[in-house]
């Protein structure tokens, strides 16, 4: 099974930065601007576990400059999957491979954290054939 979803970014014109917290979910910017087509594309594959294999989630994050190997960036996607797990929406007899493609730079006011979380949740809802809107999870 596989599902792909994307969410455009946002060019912020007026903003205030909130980076004091250690929690990535409490960081970011707030302001006004306009939406752009470039953003985040997320593809999720769900593969049945082999004999003796345990439930796992593998996250790969790619930018225009190459792969990102930063746990802080990956935590956003871990938080989304944990929310789905808490609500018992994931089949733990499957292994999940998540490929995230960031089309705009991080921490530059393009709304990439929100676009990433939303595209990931949309892809999971599609994969799981949920009728719930991703923003309701």
Language model segments and positions:
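Alpha-helical scaffolds flanking conserved acidic
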Residues: 98, 134-137
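ATP-binding N-lobe of GHMP and related small-molecule kinases
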Residues: 1-108, 130
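DPxDG-like acidic metal-binding loop motif
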Residues: 110-134
């Amino acid at each position: 099974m596989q599902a792909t979803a994307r969410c455009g970014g946002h060019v912020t014109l007026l903003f205030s930065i909130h980076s004091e917290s250690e929690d990535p979910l409490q960081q970011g910017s707030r302001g006004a601007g306009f939406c752009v087509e470039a953003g985040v594309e997320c593809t999720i594959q769900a593969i049945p576990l082999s004999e003796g294999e345990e439930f796992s989630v593998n996250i790969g994050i790619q930018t225009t400059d190459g792969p990102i190997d930063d746990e802080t960036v990956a935590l956003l996607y871990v938080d989304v999957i944990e929310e789905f797990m808490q609500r018992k929406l994931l089949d733990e007899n499957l292994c999940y491979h998540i490929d995230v493609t960031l089309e705009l730079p991080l921490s530059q006011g393009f709304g990439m954290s929100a676009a990433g979380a939303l595209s990931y949740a949309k892809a999971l809802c599609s994969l799981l054939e949920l009728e719930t809107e991703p923003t309701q999870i």
